[in-house]
């Protein structure tokens, strides 16, 4: 039986790295796909390259999609401030990037169909990540329908399937799985700020560091002080 091919959206963060490693564990030939979208934290692209090399991915592509050209998010607009006050329940945060996952998944599906890949691997997490509308199960279900209807492969009955194994997991479980799989957590990048070191105070750093402490790995926290 031929090895299944999967396209993994690889941001350079912990979640996407863990999802890619899970696909490899399932026996997939994994192709990584990363995006320079004008994000202030471009440091994550270096992390994505390191993760791809560590996992020995079959291919790794970086695509330029300048969503920062029109801003609309604290991650792409230097005039907006990245929040450090914690996640506010029921409020979509200013770190939401308009249309980001829709654009990324669409490009991922294009690559998947071109490569004959059976699935598209996503590291989205609806439980911990601030309630972004494009990280939720209903969004993924709707996009799967779109993917099936909008592609030649889908119309022929063998279109790529969206696979988001982390979508209902706690961040602590993701850390535990990353450790089990040998994901190079120290090489991943989750911080929203544009500095050379994680800030330790943005929402993403807070969630990550809390999970690392719960998993007994404070040495991997932003400030490595536990």
Curated annotation (Swiss-Prot):
<feature type="binding site">
    <location>
        <position position="191"/>
    </location>
    <ligand>
        <name>Zn(2+)</name>
    </ligand>
</feature>
<feature type="binding site">
    <location>
        <position position="199"/>
    </location>
    <ligand>
        <name>Zn(2+)</name>
    </ligand>
</feature>
<dbReference type="InterPro" id="IPR018317">
    <property type="entry name" value="QueC"/>
</dbReference>
<protein>
    <recommendedName>
        <fullName>7-cyano-7-deazaguanine synthase</fullName>
        <ecNumber>6.3.4.20</ecNumber>
    </recommendedName>
</protein>
<feature type="binding site">
    <location>
        <position position="202"/>
    </location>
    <ligand>
        <name>Zn(2+)</name>
    </ligand>
</feature>
<keyword id="KW-0436">Ligase</keyword>
<dbReference type="GO" id="GO:0008616">
    <property type="term" value="P:queuosine biosynthetic process"/>
</dbReference>
<dbReference type="GO" id="GO:0008270">
    <property type="term" value="F:zinc ion binding"/>
</dbReference>
<dbReference type="InterPro" id="IPR014729">
    <property type="entry name" value="Rossmann-like_a/b/a_fold"/>
</dbReference>
<dbReference type="Pfam" id="PF06508">
    <property type="entry name" value="QueC"/>
</dbReference>
<keyword id="KW-0479">Metal-binding</keyword>
<dbReference type="GO" id="GO:0005524">
    <property type="term" value="F:ATP binding"/>
</dbReference>
<comment type="similarity">
    <text>Belongs to the QueC family.</text>
</comment>
<keyword id="KW-0862">Zinc</keyword>
<feature type="binding site">
    <location>
        <begin position="10"/>
        <end position="20"/>
    </location>
    <ligand>
        <name>ATP</name>
    </ligand>
</feature>
<keyword id="KW-0067">ATP-binding</keyword>
<dbReference type="GO" id="GO:0016879">
    <property type="term" value="F:ligase activity, forming carbon-nitrogen bonds"/>
</dbReference>
<comment type="function">
    <text>Catalyzes the ATP-dependent conversion of 7-carboxy-7-deazaguanine (CDG) to 7-cyano-7-deazaguanine (preQ(0)).</text>
</comment>
<feature type="binding site">
    <location>
        <position position="205"/>
    </location>
    <ligand>
        <name>Zn(2+)</name>
    </ligand>
</feature>
<keyword id="KW-0547">Nucleotide-binding</keyword>
<comment type="pathway">
    <text>Purine metabolism; 7-cyano-7-deazaguanine biosynthesis.</text>
</comment>
<keyword id="KW-0671">Queuosine biosynthesis</keyword>
